[in-house]
From Swiss-Prot:
Name recorded for this polypeptide: Putative gustatory receptor 59f
UniProt KW keywords: Cell membrane, Glycoprotein, Membrane, Receptor, Transducer, Transmembrane, Transmembrane helix
Native species: Drosophila melanogaster (Fruit fly)
Pfam families on file: 7tm_7
Lineage: superkingdom: Eukaryota
Extracellular side: 58-69, 121-154, 211-259, 386-406
Record's keyword annotation contains Transmembrane: yes
Stated family: Belongs to the insect chemoreceptor superfamily. Gustatory receptor (GR) family. Gr10a subfamily.
Record-level GO BP terms: chemosensory behavior; detection of chemical stimulus involved in sensory perception of taste; male courtship behavior; monoatomic ion transmembrane transport; signal transduction
Job description of the protein: Probable gustatory receptor which mediates acceptance or avoidance behavior, depending on its substrates.
């Protein structure tokens, strides 16, 4: 926080103004990037998943205080709504559903707090991140494909919008249009998932941007190594340094979002197993579930599976680009010792595991992690079944004893 404040103070004087006044190309690229990301940034600021300082023209303290007040007000209403949902709705459910829903709601409260805390912490360095992206793209001669980026953003926001509309509609329907129950349930379960989805849209975009840049570097390296008679050592070294910077940036992105990722995995894991358990109960007792509840459960299953798979997919895409580059380097060999030494150094760098895809020290973000989640989910689901059978047997035993004593 202290270093962020120092960076923020430096920012007021210039990266933006200095570079734009001395480098017209930088100024044009900077405006182009903002135009491309504008709707995502605006929606993120309104949803409290990005600081208001990231918007052009909003760097001063007044806007920060307004945004902080909005975050505190929104979070206070959210926590209050979650409390009343627990008191008026969750406590009326059967034992197992009550416990799982209460834990899930508590995780959402903590998760939203972590997102907003991160938003406030990055108020100083978020504008500098935009500056660094433009500067590094200029250094590596990378031109942003605005249309492709806009399509990616539109797809992410479209998926969030579809989920929001369907979840709100079916939530109201399953609560039989009882207004207070519907509002409390939407506040406690739907809104946190909408907020986290908007937050992770930024995460997906950052990772996808890294993968696109890695691909471009690998294409440039391939041209240098295979299409030229004598590769230029300076160019290979430059590409190697750009790859190292992207690896460091990947690590920084995952470290920034690591607690949010952990809380999302825990929340998705609990809700996924709860929905599976409710599906099992619906199959065992068809009278317990109607059509709307089935559709609602399928919607939540799809949403949670989609979130987990998206996080792993975008990390895996970076690892695939990394492997492609390493394969290319391993295929070539040169008689000149200076070139071969440079290639060897590059290979060692690519093979060095700096744990850029590891979060919270234990979760390795690749598609293999799905196997771990499925095994854990199967074990937890078996536990829920055993608990349900035991609880039902104890309930019948207590009920029988009460009847006998009467």
């Amino acid at each position: 926080m202290r270093s962020s404040a120092t960076k923020g103070a430096k920012l007021k004087n210039s990266p933006r103004e200095r570079l734009s006044s001395f480098n017209p190309q930088y100024a044009e690229r900077y405006k182009e990037l903002y135009r491309t990301l504008f709707w995502l940034l605006l929606i993120s600021v309104l949803a409290n998943t990005a600081p208001i300082t990231i918007l052009p023209g909003c760097p001063n303290r007044f806007y920060r205080l307004v945004h902080l007040s909005w975050m505190i007000l929104w979070y206070g209403l959210f926590v209050l709504g979650s409390y009343w949902e627990f008191v008026l709705v969750t406590t009326q459910r059967v034992s197992l559903d009550r416990y799982l829903n209460a834990i899930e709601s508590a995780i959402y409260v903590v998760h939203i707090f972590s997102i907003m805390l991160l938003t406030w912490q990055c108020r100083n360095w978020a504008p500098k991140l935009m500056t660094n992206i433009v500067t590094s793209d200029l250094n590596r001669a990378y031109t942003i494909d605005c249309n492709r980026t806009k399509r990616f953003i539109r797809l992410q926001l479209f998926l969030v919008g579809i989920f929001a509309c369907l979840a709100i509609f079916f939530n109201i329907w399953t609560h039989k249009f009882v207004v207070y129950r519907s509002i409390l349930s939407i506040n406690s379960y739907v809104m946190p998932n909408i907020i986290s989805s908007i937050s992770f849209a930024q995460y997906y975009l950052l990772l996808q941007g890294i993968a696109w840049r890695q691909r471009r570097l690998t294409e440039g390296l391939e041209r240098e190594l295979t299409h030229l008679h004598s590769p230029r050592i300076s160019e290979v070294q430059k590409i190697r340094m750009h790859h190292a910077n992207l690896i460091d940036f990947t690590k920084a992105v995952n470290r920034t979002f690591q607690y949010s990722i952990l809380l999302l995995f825990v929340g998705c894991f609990l809700n996924f197993n709860l929905v599976l358990f409710l599906v099992y109960q619906g199959i065992e007792n068809p009278s317990m579930a109607d059509f709307t509840k089935w559709v609602c459960m399928l919607l939540w299953l799809a949403m949670h599976v989609g979130k987990v798979c998206s996080i792993l997919h975008f990390n895996q895409s970076i690892q695939n680009e990394h492997s492609t580059c390493l394969t290319l380097l391993s295929r070539v060999s040169y008689a000149r010792k200076d070139i071969q030494d440079t290639i060897t150094h590059f290979i060692i760098q690519m093979r060095t595991n700096v744990r850029q895809h590891v979060v919270c020290g234990v979760i390795n973000l690749d598609l293999k992690f799905l196997t771990t989640l499925l095994v854990a989910s199967a074990d937890f689901f078996i536990f829920l079944l055993q608990y349900d059978v035991t609880y039902e047997a104890l309930s019948k035993s207590v009920q029988g004893n009460v009847t006998r004593y009467k």
